[in-house]
Each structure stands twice: as structure tokens, then as C-alpha cells.
Amino acid sequence: MRLCDRDIEAWLDEGRLAINPRPPVERINGATVDVRLGNKFRTFRGHTAPFIDLSGPKAEVSAALDRVMSEEIVLPEGEAFFLHPGELALAVTYESVTLPADLVGWLDGRSSLARLGLMVHVTAHRIDPGWSGCIVLEFYNSGKLPLALRPGMPIGALSFEPLSGPAARPYNRREDAKYRDQQGAVASRIDKD
């Protein structure tokens, strides 16, 4: 069962759930909290590697990732990031989220954006118990026109689901947690699997 707006507010008030900066009540609706787009992005450089062998030797995977991923792009205030049709890019939420060991989060894109072809998360929409940090967004433009994305715009909604008990291995305590405390548009770390 997911938390309703009253429970989300109570968990925030009690410090069991943290969203920084704390959203105003107008952004807590029914069973979700609206999140906004941050100002950090990362893109893919075209034609810099013939392919990425996802199950290949880790050193080769790491080298291919280094070739295809851009450095992090930090947009100045007021500027837009343009996502062209068929492009994939990474970005982050403006808000940082910290979940306790007994709560899982779910990120959903906005229907209004999806109707323009914008996918906010390609597949990874679960936020693990024990997570702390900004949430990386996996943008894909499946539409016909470039989309101007501006930091601060509403980009998605988070919902929260209590677990039957605290997780034995929450994300913040796992040795293999590749994205712990991320604040920027962190590239894939599949080579760390």
C-alpha cells in the first residue's frame, strides 16, 4: 500500500523520509510528491565506440563507457537543455531524497510530458530502501521535435510504499552500492557489476 498525501507529510514531519528542499504542500498530491528537474546533465557522444559489450571484460566496458559518455554539463540559470528526437541523456532531480530502510520509492514521469514523447526514466524507476541522493533521470525523446528542458520545471512524481519490515541490506549499507550519495548525472557504472 502506498503512502497517501497525509502520510507523506507525516513521514516528512517525523524525519522518517527526507526530501531536500522540502516540497511545499502544493506539490504533495494524493499519493505523490512532484519533483523538479535539476541543472546537471550528461549526454552520449555519437560514433566514439562501435559498440559496448555489456558482458565483456570490465576494463573494455569501462574504456567504452569513458569514450561514449560526456562530461557532466551544468546549465547556468535560465538556460535550456535541448533533447532531440531519438536522443538519450541523463539528468538529475533538483531534490535530494533519503529513504529509510523500510520504505521503497517509485518515480513516474508526467503524463503531459509523455504525450510529447519524453520518457523520464527508461526503465529504472525504483528508489531502493536506504537510498540517499538526487535521482538520476534517464531521458529519451521518442517524439518528432526537440524538447527544451529547463532546470526547475516539474519533471516527475515520487510515490512511496512501506515494506513489511526494514530491509536487511538497504542501499546505504551495501558494499556494492555503485551510486551511493549521488548528486550529479552519474554515468552508468555497469563495469562495476
UniProtKB/Swiss-Prot annotation:
GO terms for molecular function: dCTP deaminase activity; nucleotide binding. Residues 172-181 have a biased composition (Basic and acidic residues). GO terms for biological process: dUMP biosynthetic process; dUTP biosynthetic process; nucleobase-containing small molecule interconversion. DCTP binds at R110, S111, S112, L113, A114, R115, D128, V136, L137, E138, Y171, K178, Q182. CDD domains: trimeric_dUTPase. HAMAP family: dCTP_deaminase. This is dCTP deaminase. It comes from Klebsiella pneumoniae subsp. pneumoniae (strain ATCC 700721 / MGH 78578). The gene is dcd.
